[in-house]
Regions:
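C-terminal, extended alpha-helical scaffolding domains
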Residues: 160-373
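Phox homology (PX) phosphoinositide-binding domain
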Residues: 1-200, 204-207
């Protein structure tokens, strides 16, 4: 799996993506479920789902008030194979201008690149489902069970232009409201600390993700471009360049898998945690406003019952969110620390291995050039 999120597996409900099929404009995921829960008709079953259905499930969690106190697992990114397909298409068009050996080698490399993106896409969608299945509350959601068990198309479509525009305006309003909520000092020191930390953490991960992408692009393009130019001039070391190029490609792939994907995932999940704190902050503001309204109603002896009811509803909502939010944020910390530690250690080990391989190649090449071998 591209992103290790340190999930606690539960034998009563296990979900994975057992197969996936890439078509021209979509990917079909076979979602496989094993469960001993009484809610399901069978103990083991599979359904075929598309990306839009994953987004529908994610949005149904976000829009459900009952889950306001939980970190909603981030939605998987949309599959994007356009760049790889375009390269394969251009390769086909230029087949006549290169040797059979060159064409075969280029085709194999592009197919490997396409396969890597495909596997990463499948892994990201599987992580989302595993996170939901591991969550003690979200795993009981009716929509989630429908997603897993209903063996027909869910008739879910992507959002049209009007709906996307509405989402845009909602986000603008939410951003403005977020500034107001962020300015309110929390009554609980734990949440005040988490709010400050998450804002800084999210920005740092965002910056690291952008730098990681630039570093990987550098491995994939500039270094390889330099080698292609030098290749024609230094025939004696052409074999070294070819082997080094392959090692650099593996370095880029490892960095993409172990670092870039990890940063992108936790960029999305830290945003989900920030959204949780926003919902709690909004509930706190509503509760404080309800208290003020109740004081005014009592002072004027007007609409007191209505004000008391509103105050009680706001109080219950705030307390309910606070109760679950604290444990969610503690679990989030445990998860992310374990994931970063595991992936960074594995990446360091892989890069040491590749560096040793490069060193051996250079030493071997120097020996050849000096006439030692």
């Amino acid at each position: 799996m591209a992103v290790n999120v340190d999930l606690q597996t539960d034998a009563t409900l296990q979900v994975d993506i057992s197969d996936a099929l890439s078509e021209r404009d979509k990917v079909k995921f076979t979602v496989h479920t094993k469960s001993t829960l009484p809610n399901f008709k069978q103990n083991e079953f599979s359904v075929v789902r598309q990306h839009e259905e994953f987004i529908w499930l994610h949005d149904s969690f976000v829009e459900n008030e009952e889950y306001a106190g939980y970190i909603i697992p981030p939605a998987p990114p949309r599959p994007d194979f356009d760049a790889s397909r375009e390269k394969l298409q251009k390769l086909g068009e230029g087949e006549g201008s290169m040797t059979k050996e060159e064409f075969t080698k280029m085709k194999q490399e592009l197919e490997a690149e396409y396969l890597a993106i495909f596997k990463k896409t499948v892994a990201m969608h599987e992580v989302f489902l595993c996170r939901v299945a591991a969550h003690p509350v979200l795993r009981k959601d009716l929509n989630f069970h429908v997603f897993l068990e209903y063996n027909q198309d869910l008739s879910v479509r992507g959002k049209n232009k009007k709906e996307r525009l509405e989402d845009f305006f909602k986000n603008v309003v939410k951003s403005a409201d977020g500034v107001l909520v962020a300015g309110v000092k929390d009554v609980d020191d734990f949440f005040e600390h988490e709010k400050t930390f998450l804002l800084e953490y999210h920005n740092r991960v965002k910056e690291a993700s952008a730098k990681s992408d630039r570093k990987i692009r550098s491995h994939k393009s500039k270094f390889l471009l330099s080698l292609s130019y030098l290749y024609g001039f230094f025939l004696k070391v052409s074999e070294l360049f070819e082997k080094t190029r392959k090692i650099e490609a593996r370095v880029a792939a490892d960095e993409d898998l172990k670092l870039a994907d990890l940063l992108k995932y936790y960029l999305r999940e830290s945003q989900a945690a920030k959204d949780l704190l926003y919902r709690r902050g909004r509930a706190l503001v509503d509760y404080e406003n309800a208290n003020k309204a109740l004081d005014k109603a009592r002072a004027k002896n007007k609409d007191v019952l209505q004000a008391e009811t509103t105050q009680q509803v706001c109080c219950q909502k705030f307390e309910k969110i606070s109760e679950s939010a604290k444990q969610e944020l503690i679990d989030f910390k445990t998860r992310r620390v374990a994931a970063f530690r595991k992936n960074l250690v594995e990446l360091a080990e892989l890069e040491l291995k590749h560096a040793k391989g490069n060193l051996q190649l250079l030493q071997s090449c120097l020996g050849v050039l000096k006439g030692d071998t």
